[in-house]
Design a protein with these regions (language model features):
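Transmembrane beta-barrel strands of outer-membrane/channel proteins
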Residues: 60-66, 79, 88-94, 159-163
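Flexible, solvent-exposed coil segments and beta strand-coil junctions
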Residues: 49-57, 117-128, 171-186
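Outer-membrane beta-barrel proteins
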Residues: 4-9, 61-76, 98-148, 184-188
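Flexible loop and strand-edge segments within Gram-negative outer membrane beta-barrel domains
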Residues: 134-140, 150-188
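N-terminal periplasmic accessory domains that precede
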Residues: 5-11, 21, 34-61, 71-75
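Outer-membrane beta-barrel strand-turn architecture
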Residues: 80-83, 149-153
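Short acidic/polar hinge/loop motifs at secondary-structure boundaries
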Residues: 1-25, 29, 143
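Short beta-strands and strand-coil junctions in structured, solvent-facing domains, enriched
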Residues: 25-29, 46-49, 95
Length: 188
């Protein structure tokens, strides 16, 4: 487990219906990785119709953010009848490099950034815009499909499929402090 763990971003925030945070040890219920607590995210459910008319919900969303040049598009559709319902959701996000606002403290300016040369070695490069954190951008797609079937009031069958794919998410946490005399060195 080296570097940042990005599991939580594999869920589109626009498909979340409810969130639960359990503080403290929850490893008995959720396994040894839950020793410090648990974050549960409950995604939207397919909704049945309660009368003879189909229950249809359509949500369309788009967003732009200047801090990361983020472009996000989202669509979800619920089609429910009395005994069976379908929910489909698709999200696409493109995140650019993070950019600090003009009123931010100068301590956070990035005069240099770390990249790799053709030999795979870390090198320090001069940043043309010190307000931009280079190599922090990535892209992502999310797909969610849910089906619910209730043949009678005593039986309910749910099926859920979730697919998420992210582009290369750079290791920004590994950012090494530069020393003008000695080059790069890792924090001790």
């Amino acid at each position: 487990r080296g570097g940042n763990i990005h599991n939580v971003i594999s869920i589109s925030p626009l498909t979340i219906e409810n969130t639960e945070v359990i503080l403290g040890s929850a490893s008995v219920l959720y396994g040894s990785d839950a020793i410090g607590g648990v974050m549960n995210f409950y995604t939207k459910k397919a909704r049945l119709s309660f009368d003879s008319n189909p229950h249809i919900e359509l949500n369309i969303n788009s967003r732009y953010s200047s801090a990361s040049s983020e472009k996000m598009y989202h669509l979800d559709l619920n089609y429910g009848m009395k005994k069976i319902a379908f929910l489909s959701s698709f999200s696409k996000s493109d995140f650019g490099d993070l950019k600090m606002g003009i009123n931010g403290p100068s301590d956070y300016l990035r005069p240099n950034y770390v990249t790799q040369n053709s030999n795979g070695e870390d090198i320090l490069v001069i940043n043309s815009n010190t307000r931009v954190q280079r190599n922090t951008g990535y892209d992502q797609i999310n797909f969610l499909q849910k089906v619910i079937y209730e043949p009678n009031e005593n039986l309910s069958i749910d099926l859920g499929i979730h697919f998420s794919e992210t582009g290369n998410i750079p290791r920004y946490d590994r950012l090494i402090r530069g020393n003008q005399n000695q080059g790069l060195h890792y924090a001790e």
